[in-house]
Amino acid sequence: VGSGNPEEGELRPQLLDRFGMHAEIRTVRDPETRVRVVEERSAFDQNPDECLAANAEQLEALKKQITDAQELLTSVELDYEFRVKISQVCGSLDVDGLRGDIVTNRAAKAYAAYNGRSKVTLEDIEKVITLCLRHRLRKDPLESIDSGDKVSSVFEEVFN
C-alpha cells in the first residue's frame, strides 16, 4: 500500500508499474458527511475500545467475508475468453509488459471470491480493470481524457 500527493510530482512509470492497483481518492465535499467522519474519528481518538466494540458485529462479518474469500480463491475460475479479452484491453491501451494482464486476472478472481462466487463474471472484470490499468498508461500531455475513462472506454469496446 502506498499513498502520494500528485501535487508533489508524478512517480516514474517503472515504479508505478510495481503497484498492482491504483485507486484515486478525492476529498469528501458534502458537509454532513465530513462532519460525520470528523465526529467518528474524534470518538475513536477518545475511546478506541468503545468504537471497536460498537462496530464489532460489522468487523466480524467483514473478517468472515475475507476469510471465506481466501478459502474460495484457489478454486475461482476465469474463462479463457475473458482472459483473452483482458489481454486485448491491455494491448489496445499499449500497456507495457504483462503485469497489467496478470494483476487484472488476479483482481477479478479475488473480487469474485469476495462476493462468494467461484466463477468470474463480466461485472467482476469491469469493477477491477480500471483500478489495475489506469496507472499503467502512458501520459500524453495533449490528451484531455482521464486515464480511467480511457480504460473504461476500451473495456466497453472489447467486451461488448
Predicted segments with their positions:
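Canonical AAA+ ATPase core
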Residues: V1-A56, A69, Y111
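Solvent-exposed alpha-helical segments within well-ordered globular domains of core cellular machineries
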Residues: V1, P13, D17, E32-E40, ...
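C-terminal engagement/docking regions of AAA+ P-loop ATPases
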Residues: S87-R99, A110-N160
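Short, flexible active-site loop motifs that bind/organize anionic cofactors or intermediates
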Residues: E24, L73, N115
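Conserved AAA+ ATPase small/helical "lid" subdomain
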Residues: D49-T104
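Short secondary-structure transition/capping segments
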Residues: P31-E39, L73, S144-S153
